[in-house]
């Protein structure tokens, strides 16, 4: 991670402030009692479109908007798509979002509500939608916005950690969701540059833990993915994603 990464994150937080919400950092009495420690929750469920994905999407789209692109292409299993559609509507940008045919109807309707055009791919998986989206973008010379395999997106997701440290710098460990690795590589990278002894613990759904298994194996592999309630952090990884090496460098422990 670039030694000035924390500065880029702070700049991103200022850049996207008009497009996101500052979410609460809330003490949890019940989890604190259960664990015998002080537990705080960063409530990104109160974020615009209901997910931290709003941060990375806003940062990348604001950067792309400087070149006034005719259209921007992305792929998603749902939450990233909603985030991109919302930010694009705010910025007056046209986006085309590739989604797997298995996307939940609620997430599909939410994306359409923001006015984005969608393409449902025949394949089931998120990475298949990503492959189709990348191919379409390259064929038509449009910019492609990855849900996680992009440093500007990662920097945007890391603004979550920047907000946390504005409220509380006294903690020993942080537990972060690890799907494609964009959130945890960004937050982990920022926190480790600010608090050298913080422990970063990755949390993945047992039924779909691609990055967890990749870190264990030392390489990205094709694994079986089963249904999970945590569909927002599920799915396979794009081979060659920058988040693999970033996650290896910042994750201290990984659990499912």
Task: Give short role names for the model-derived ranges.
Residues 1-256:
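PLP-dependent amino-acid enzyme catalytic core
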């Amino acid at each position: 991670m670039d030694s000035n990464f924390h500065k880029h994150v702070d700049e991103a937080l200022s850049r996207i402030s008009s497009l996101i919400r500052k979410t609460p950092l809330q003490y949890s009495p019940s989890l604190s009692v259960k664990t015998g420690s002080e537990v705080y929750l960063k409530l990104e469920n109160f974020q615009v479109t209901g997910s931290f994905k709003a941060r990375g999407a806003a940062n990348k789209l604001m950067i792309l908007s400087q070149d006034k692109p005719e259209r921007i292409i992305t792929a998603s299993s749902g939450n990233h798509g909603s985030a991109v559609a919302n930010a694009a509507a705010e910025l007056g940008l046209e986006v085309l979002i590739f989604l797997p045919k298995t996307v939940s109807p609620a997430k599909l309707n939410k994306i359409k509500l923001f006015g984005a055009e969608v393409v449902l791919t025949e394949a089931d998986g998120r990475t298949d939608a990503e492959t189709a989206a990348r191919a379409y973008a390259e064929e038509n010379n449009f910019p492609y916005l990855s849900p996680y395999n992009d440093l500007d997106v990662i920097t945007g997701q890391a603004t979550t950690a920047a907000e946390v440290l504005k409220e509380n710098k006294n903690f020993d460990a942080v537990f972060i969701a690890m799907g494609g690795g964009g959130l945890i590589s960004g937050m982990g990278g920022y926190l480790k540059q600010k608090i050298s002894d913080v422990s970063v613990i990755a949390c993945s759904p047992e039924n779909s833990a691609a990055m967890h298994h990749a870190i264990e194996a030392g390489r990205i592999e094709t694994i079986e993915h089963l249904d999970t309630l945590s569909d927002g952090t599920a799915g396979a990884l794009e081979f060659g994603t920058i988040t693999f090496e970033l996650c290896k460098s910042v994750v201290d422990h990984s659990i499912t």
